[in-house]
Swiss-Prot record:
The keyword Thylakoid does not apply. Interacts with RNA polymerase; probably competes with TFS4 for the same binding site. This is Transcription factor S1. GO terms for biological process: DNA-templated transcription; positive regulation of DNA-templated transcription. SMART domains: RPOL9, ZnF_C2C2. Induces RNA cleavage activity in the RNA polymerase. Induces rapid cleavage of a stalled transcription elongation complex with a 2-nucleotide reduction at the 3' end of the nascent RNA. Truncated RNA is able to resume elongation. During transcription elongation it enhances processivity. Involved in transcriptional proofreading and fidelity. Misincorporation of nucleotides during elongation of transcription leads to arrested elongation complexes which are rescued by TFS-promoted removal of a dinucleotide from the 3'-end. It comes from Saccharolobus solfataricus (strain ATCC 35092 / DSM 1617 / JCM 11322 / P2). Residues 63-114 are annotated as: C-ZR. Pfam families: Zn_ribbon_RPB9, Zn_ribbon_TFIIS.
Length: 114
């Protein structure tokens, strides 16, 4: 199950990280951190993709089911701070899913990996 946490200060999406040997959720925009309770297990890994891997192509008007609007994520093209986001399992099941974003202003689509 994937749980998305949002920053209480700026409403941006928070991602799990290690900080000083402890598991925390860190805001991608303002850097706010919240320690994860010891009963919660957070696993993260970095995945390097090769050029030979398949690329997911979305039609311009196509939005996957479950896409949600989020504020506080900056578009790399127009610097708009609002986008749609969705999560897809683009690789093997034992690897983390990929987060996709689509800018509400210019329509640019980009992705983030854990």
């Amino acid at each position: 199950m994937i749980v998305v946490k949002f920053c209480p200060k700026c409403n941006s999406m928070m991602v799990p990280k290690k900080s000083n040997g402890k598991n925390v959720y860190r805001c991608t925009k303002c850097g706010y951190e919240k320690e994860v309770p010891e009963t919660t297990i957070v696993v993260t890994s970095k995945v390097k993709h090769s050029i030979k891997e398949k690329t997911l192509v979305l039609e311009e008007e196509e939005m996957p089911s479950g896409a949600q609007k989020i504020k506080g994520v900056l578009c790399p093209s127009c610097k708009n701070d609002e986008a749609y986001f969705w999560i897809l399992q683009t690789r093997r099941a034992d690897e983390p899913p990929t987060r996709f974003y689509k800018c509400t202003k210019c329509g640019k689509v980009w992705r983030e990996y854990e």
